[in-house]
């Protein structure tokens, strides 16, 4: 009798576990089908954002996606062939949950109106601040998920240092650590093997060596600059930094008209559509160009195989304008900035270089009494528009696409000394320069 009961009990358990296993197989097959069904759309979206965030106009972006999706071998050989572009494949959108998020975008709900009382304005500002910081933290945690697709390590990043929580340190400690980060431009003495005849055109000194400025402004290209009316304020700074091909003409009321320095990614310098050699936008200013390299590559490796070959146009520009001030970031030191970000983040960062914005901030902090960064931490005018000068929408540009943007912005706000009204209503964070620090 006991044997019969045991047999029935074993049989029932086998049936139960068998049914569970069968249901699991059905469920997993269903999700595999969904993954395959959405893979094409996802990859197109991801590549669109990759190209767009690296400097291509949207119409050129879509053209390049269509012409590259069948060319898988380009990824494998991208590091060896400067004409090839590393395409982000088999990965999720960089901000996959933005549409499902309850974070308000393109609304004037939190904008302080003329008839608002001071208390009402403060309440709006605090409500927006809480929601924005919560959203940035959510994106940061989402991006650090090691099981999440899209965690490719294209630059072979091997980080072995600590991962600390920046909030357990004081803002002064964070800035003192940043002060010790070596971020430099290429100098003539750095180049030992001159492959392109480049050496004689490289400056002998570092960018802004021995130069100091009182007030510095960095103008992001964010769509939230629209209707800010910050133009006159921006033009009042001693130094004004802009990015890539962001225009001022027609947008002076919001972003000003003065430009002292432009940071250009290597695509803007190397691709014909940006007219680097002919556009007046790139004349009579200081230019700082950058191009990423492998995390462990030597300078000689990068000079031989840049991601995008900016050197021919760099040399031609120097020939055309011998007195021009044009510099190139030492690509090895860009990863020192990434190491700094990872060291102050308890979770793993996306293993791509930091953004041009954060690189620009680090550069200027060594030369400015303070740096005001406009619309880096997005104000109440936050919008899905990527850029103030183009109509295309994509909220991913604000919260993180290819660079570890959410981590950068959280850290920058943590060391900010501007009031919440300045940050979230006017639209700038203020970071004190290194010369004001007592480390």
Give each language-model segment a name.
Residues 2-439:
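Metal-ion/cofactor- or nucleotide/acyl-coenzyme-handling active-site neighborhoods
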